[in-house]
């Protein structure tokens, strides 16, 4: 079952057409620090699929090399559910090593010793700022030692275990409003000529109902919500797709799955980035949906 599911995901990825004009944008289920915990750990909230060596881990292992080989990006731009700002979009700007921000608590010590090597790029950061300002979206570069949060370095450590030799730039979400984030994505579409743009979150993220994280214990409403997400993503026509994606916030289980929507709305950045093309779900694992947007038609 597990191996056939992984083969299915790989088949979906390989079916994405070879790059012609723009690199597809990726909506990525970034997972949690539990991806670094062994399946034998005592935790009963998260299934083994969400832990070290589980199905989500295996998907990320396969995804990283695929992205670099298929699209050969000159850099990676990433939005994370864990990087919010107020008033304007923040673009992390530096040329040296990206530090890491261990923004999780109560985990074993070794999870605070994880290393992931990558460098930023002030030049690419400036390109992002220019593209956003062309759309009258307030934006500024920031520096300092905040570093990449775990919504970036946890999945990227699995995807690129030896680090990256192309620049990696993190960008904030300046709002949780779906249409504003969709417009942020649209503003950056031209950068897909050279760069892979990733928008990371989770389609289920609640600490008010821990049973929701595990498919074996989750109420049927969470599973129905995920099915509606999958259908919305793969809607063919751009306007219909956008309407269905926006309509997901009216689903009876939306607020149960997201008491606060910061982990859901990165989906709208990816949708805006790929608003001019097709979209394809490449991982339908429960609670860990990932998809490409902006596939050439």
Swiss-Prot record:
Swiss-Prot/TrEMBL keywords: Cytoplasm, Metal-binding, Nucleus, Oxidoreductase, Zinc
Positions with a binding annotation for Zn(2+): 30, 82, 205, 263
Cofactor note: Binds 1 zinc ion per subunit.
Subcellular location: Cytoplasm; Nucleus
UniProt cofactor(s): Zn(2+)
GO molecular function, one term: oxidoreductase activity, acting on single donors with incorporation of molecular oxygen, incorporation of two atoms of oxygen
CDD domains the UniProt entry points to: 45_DOPA_Dioxygenase
InterPro entries with a match to the protein in the record: Extradiol_dOase_DODA, Xdiol_dOase_suB
Keyword Cytoplasm: yes
One cellular-component annotation, GO: cytosol
Family in the record: Belongs to the DODA-type extradiol aromatic ring-opening dioxygenase family.
Summary of the function given for this chain in its UniProt record: May be involved in the metabolism of aromatic compounds.
The protein's name in its UniProt record: 4,5-DOPA dioxygenase extradiol-like protein
Native source organism of the sequence: Schizosaccharomyces pombe (strain 972 / ATCC 24843)
Lineage per the UniProt record: Eukaryota, Fungi, Dikarya, Ascomycota, Taphrinomycotina
């Amino acid at each position: 079952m597990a191996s056939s599911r992984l083969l299915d995901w790989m088949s979906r990825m390989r079916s994405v057409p070879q790059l012609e004009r723009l690199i597809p944008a990726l909506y990525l289920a970034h997972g949690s620090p539990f991806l670094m915990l062994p399946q034998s750990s005592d935790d009963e909230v998260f299934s083994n699929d969400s832990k070290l060596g589980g199905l989500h881990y295996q998907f990320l292992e396969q995804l990283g090399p695929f992205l670099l080989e298929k699209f050969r990006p000159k850099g990676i731009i990433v939005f994370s559910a864990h990087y919010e700002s107020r008033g304007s979009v923040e673009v992390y700007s530096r040329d040296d090593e990206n530090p890491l921000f261990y923004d999780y608590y109560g985990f074993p010590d070794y999870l605070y010793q994880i290393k992931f090597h990558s460098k930023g790029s002030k030049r690419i950061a400036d390109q992002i700022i220019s593209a956003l300002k062309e759309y009258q979206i307030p934006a500024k570069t920031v520096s300092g030692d905040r570093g990449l949060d775990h919504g970036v370095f946890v999945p990227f450590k699995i995807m690129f275990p030896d680090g990256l030799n192309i620049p990696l730039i993190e960008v904030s979400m300046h709002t949780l409003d779906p249409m504003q984030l969709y417009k942020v994505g649209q503003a950056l579409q031209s950068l897909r000529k050279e760069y892979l743009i990733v928008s990371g979150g989770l389609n289920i993220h609640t600490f008010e109902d821990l049973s929701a994280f595990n498919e074996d214990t989750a109420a049927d409403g969470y599973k129905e919500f995920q099915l509606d997400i999958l259908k919305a993503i793969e809607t063919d026509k751009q306007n219909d797709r956008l309407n269905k994606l926006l309509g997901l916030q009216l689903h009876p289980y939306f607020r149960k799955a997201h008491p606060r929507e910061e982990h859901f709305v990165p989906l709208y950045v990816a949708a805006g980035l790929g608003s001019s093309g097709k979209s394809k779900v490449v991982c339908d694992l429960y609670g860990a949906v990932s998809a490409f947007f902006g596939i050439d038609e």
